[in-house]
């Protein structure tokens, strides 16, 4: 069974490869801001867990019907999204070095929560059969003794501040951030069915 990764995230691709999975990468092209805005208008403010689960689902669903390598998708689609929550504020990925630096300075000496949402869809002959979503949470503690120069080194390496994306040669991250997983909450359509699908 093939796994289709609905993401161009280097971190997610690296994590899958670390456990021996070589997925088919299919970009999803979801307008995340518009999707969150629409959901908020319809259902009220989303918390971080609901937001990453929603975006993970939309990314997975966005590639249904696509034909990577000229063939219908047949296997399992994986969509993912993550967000960092600190002091009641939710942060997405910083797309500019200056924003990344400002966030490091703000987060120094504080503890926040990283929310990671995933959504998988079993696809047979190009049609969705079953789906399952879950959100994991990790407590992220930023040490107070990290220097401005170490933060600058981290930003200069352009390391994506996302769980699983840690460059070994950037001590600003590996030495000054303590990540403690705190379990996962599931948003499921059919747990048993999806587990069976991924085991086939």
Q: Can you say where each PLM-predicted feature lies in the sequence?
A:
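Acidic/polar active-site rim loop that often engages polyanionic ligands
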Residues: 36-40, 85-86, 128-137, 178-182
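N-terminal polybasic phosphate/anion-binding patch
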Residues: 1-76, 149, 153-157, 195-198
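Short beta-strand scaffold segments in enzyme catalytic cores
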Residues: 82-85, 114-123, 167
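Generic enzyme active-site microenvironment
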Residues: 79
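Conserved anionic group-binding/transfer micro-motifs
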Residues: 56, 100, 189
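GST superfamily/GST-like fold recognition
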Residues: 1-21, 110, 125, 135-200
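Active-site-adjacent loop/tail segments of enzyme domains
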Residues: 82-113
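Anionic-ligand binding region
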Residues: 101-105, 116-139
């Amino acid at each position: 069974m093939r796994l289709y990764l609905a993401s161009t995230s280097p971190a997610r691709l690296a994590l899958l490869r670390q456990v021996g999975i070589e997925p088919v990468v299919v970009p999803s092209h979801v307008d995340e801001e518009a999707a969150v805005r629409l959901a908020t208008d319809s259902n009220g403010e989303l918390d971080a867990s609901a937001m990453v689960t929603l975006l993970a689902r939309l990314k997975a669903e966005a590639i249904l019907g696509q034909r990577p390598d000229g063939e219908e998708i047949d296997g399992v689609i994986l969509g993912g999204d993550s967000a960092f929550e600190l002091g009641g504020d939710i942060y997405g990925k910083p797309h500019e070095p200056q924003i990344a630096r400002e966030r490091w300075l703000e987060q120094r000496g504080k503890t926040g929560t990283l929310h990671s949402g995933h959504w998988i869809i079993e696809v047979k002959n190009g049609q969705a059969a079953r789906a399952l979503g879950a959100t994991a949470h990790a407590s992220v503690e930023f040490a107070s003794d990290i220097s401005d120069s170490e933060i600058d080194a981290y930003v200069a390496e352009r390391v994506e501040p996302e769980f699983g994306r840690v460059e070994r040669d950037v001590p600003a991250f590996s030495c000054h951030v303590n990540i403690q997983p705190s379990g996962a909450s599931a948003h499921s359509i059919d747990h048993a069915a999806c587990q069976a699908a991924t085991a086939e």
